[in-house]
Amino acid sequence: MIRRYWNINFEEMMKAGVHFGHGTRKWNPRMAPYISAKRKGIHITNLTRTARFLSEACDLVFDAASRRKQFLIVGTKNKAADSVARAAIRARCHYVNKKWLGGILTNWSTTETRLQKFRDLRMEQKAGRLNRLPKGDAARLKRQLAHLQTYLGGIKYMTGLPDIVIIVDQQEEYTALRECMTLGIPTICLIDTNCDPDLADISIPTNDDAIASIRLILNKLVFAICEGRSSYIRNP
């Protein structure tokens, strides 16, 4: 895999608050190599390590995108949800930004059935057929469609397991991470000072509680994905 330059700027990371970790009482000792200091009761992340692993992650997704691999971005907490959707749509990735429904990946056959039901209901609605049903039936199916849109809308075009999963907040998305580990799906995980850096294939130490920090890291990753897709188009 060729190493590339991704314009990862320390001043930009500082401005976004990437370096701010959790309180010193709320930390995982395994994060010690990724922490550079303590300041006013807060751990400070070593941005040199952040830049290194973010660069490695960008190289990985660029290479995967240039080979037409599929990506899933997962981030369901309120501070991450909007950034996850925007980043995924920009890079034509699948995403989950509401509740992670257990078994989305490990019970893929059930997920496929749900997705087919979702697609069928969308077609029925677009064709206006739901409005021709009795009011009770129409209301029930519309509620079902709204539920599927909320939780599966970001993966409605997914036809198989993803090749790489990008996870925002290891602790919040632990179920999704465990499913990836069970299936052997490579993961890139944004980790704060209270996380375990050994659980993902590439862990990027960062502030996973600040919108600006999450957005910056995701923007770098999706830029690399877009560049990789363009590389495939130029050199199929």
UniProtKB/Swiss-Prot annotation:
One record GO biological process = translation
Lineage: superkingdom: Eukaryota
Any one GO CC term of this protein is: chloroplast
Please give one Pfam family short name: Ribosomal_S2
Q: Does the keyword Ribonucleoprotein apply?
A: yes
Keywords on record: Chloroplast, Plastid, Ribonucleoprotein, Ribosomal protein
Q: Where found in the cell?
A: Plastid, Chloroplast
What does the record give under GO molecular function? structural constituent of ribosome
Enumerate the NCBIfam families for this protein: rpsB_bact
What does the sequence similarity comment in the record state about its family?
Belongs to the universal ribosomal protein uS2 family.
- Matching HAMAP family: Ribosomal_uS2_B (MF_00291_B)
Record's protein name: Small ribosomal subunit protein uS2c
